[in-house]
Amino acid sequence: MATEDYTHPEFLVDAAWVDAHKDDSNVVIVDCEVDAAFARGHIPGAVLVPDNYEKDPDSGRLFLMQPEQFRTMCEGLGIGDDSTVITYDHSRSLTAARLWWALNTYGHTDVKILNGGWRAWIANGGAVDFGRAAPKSATFTPKRDESKLVKVDELKQACQVGDSVIWDVRSDSEWDGTNSRGNKRVGHVPGAVHLEWFNLMDSETNEFKPANEIRRILTEHGITPDKNVYTY
């Protein structure tokens, strides 16, 4: 699918682009699936993101890694300051987008998501590998951008401001409290709007929906460019 109509089309690449650039010296392709899925086949040259990298090693909670931990992980994957990173998964870009966000939060903006992920790669006739590639030698400098994060007190203040939208992207059962997902408390942030993340994805291709359709869906939920948007 063409991406020119997106505000930032450079955030996405298609399978043909990845195939043409996968051997470039500065390109690092990161498979964001679990070990078992990676072993069943992956893009040649791809490296596997560590399992549960998104969890704080001390508390086990889903916090962003501390700078030195994130640096160590990136260098272990061969991601350096000058790398062009391509992320992909089998899951409608859920985990690929999380790594995209984490890298951007740590100041690495040259990162793109393979639109359609593994399904798009196979549909394009892409080659499949089963071994593990040796990561490239790399130096990663974390530059954490706190503006991409919000603390609880700041979110509480945002609840009181008319120019803000708090967007709950979780499942229906998490939203209504019937599924705790292991959390001590259930429900949702007061005043939040609910739109599960996968509503922006094409269930047949695993690609992002067209830009005009995404805009329509977001607008119907009050998520518009004039608002400060907080997601969780």
Short names for language-model regions:
Residues 3-81, 157-226:
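Positively charged, proline/Ser/Thr-rich regional signature most characteristic
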